[in-house]
């Protein structure tokens, strides 16, 4: 194992405390359920489908994205450091008859033993919750096969993202629990791409994720001011 784990105990506890409500479609994780079809479709389109491919979902939590990828025929491994979310994920997979594997580990430790193991790696809404996002990105690069795809999603750091993600989503609309995010840990696209460039991953595209509070819906678009997804490939 790595001597110093790239983990924030406060972040782990935050999601441990909410774990039992992970699959409540009207609970704290409602936004993840709402955006999941968009995330899944984006991954499917850029990775040319997932059927039969080995896929790693980093920071899988209760398994929302991991399960949906398994249902597309992927051989999925979900990775997380939260014990409670993983127990919820395993139980839900059992209840739905979805076949996939969940592992409690840091990505750094997993990468040390599984180099070039996966065709696709997803790391969604996770980088802003760890002390060293570059370490996570490097590990993702190590885990994916040459020619494979890695997807990162996170939040931009600017005034608009503070107003939307912190003031709006947490304080006013109560879409997510207050304290879920730390604006200082948000990552600008230029910063994320600079970190990606320090690996053998190549950025292939970037898209924004937009929330409409009037219709309570999300859509993908060009604007990356708040939430965004980056598609990379290993060459």
Curated annotation (Swiss-Prot):
Report keywords, A-Z.
Answer: Methyltransferase, S-adenosyl-L-methionine, Transferase, Ubiquinone biosynthesis
> Which processes are annotated in GO (biological process)?
methylation
The reactions it catalyses are: a 3-demethylubiquinol + S-adenosyl-L-methionine = a ubiquinol + S-adenosyl-L-homocysteine + H(+); a 3-(all-trans-polyprenyl)benzene-1,2-diol + S-adenosyl-L-methionine = a 2-methoxy-6-(all-trans-polyprenyl)phenol + S-adenosyl-L-homocysteine + H(+)
Give the top-level enzyme category: transferase
Which terms does the record give in the GO molecular function aspect?
Answer: 2-polyprenyl-6-hydroxyphenol methylase activity; 3-demethylubiquinol 3-O-methyltransferase activity; polyprenyldihydroxybenzoate methyltransferase activity
Task: Specify whether Methyltransferase is a keyword of the entry.
Answer: yes
Could you tell me the superkingdom of the organism this chain comes from? Bacteria
Please give the Pfam families that the UniProt record associates with this protein: Methyltransf_23
InterPro entries, per database record = SAM-dependent_MTases_sf, UbiG_MeTrfase
**What Enzyme Commission number(s) does the record list for this chain?**
2.1.1.222, 2.1.1.64
The pathway entry for this protein reads as: Cofactor biosynthesis; ubiquinone biosynthesis
Which residues of the sequence carry a binding annotation for S-adenosyl-L-methionine? 39, 59, 80, 124
Matching entries from Gene3D superfamilies are given as:
Vaccinia Virus protein VP39
Q: Which NCBIfam families match?
A: UbiG
Q: What does this protein do?
A: O-methyltransferase that catalyzes the 2 O-methylation steps in the ubiquinone biosynthetic pathway.
Similarity remark: Belongs to the methyltransferase superfamily. UbiG/COQ3 family.
Q: What is this protein called?
A: Ubiquinone biosynthesis O-methyltransferase
| Origin species | Vibrio vulnificus (strain YJ016)
Lineage, please?
Bacteria, Pseudomonadati, Pseudomonadota, Gammaproteobacteria, Vibrionales
Give the gene symbol: ubiG
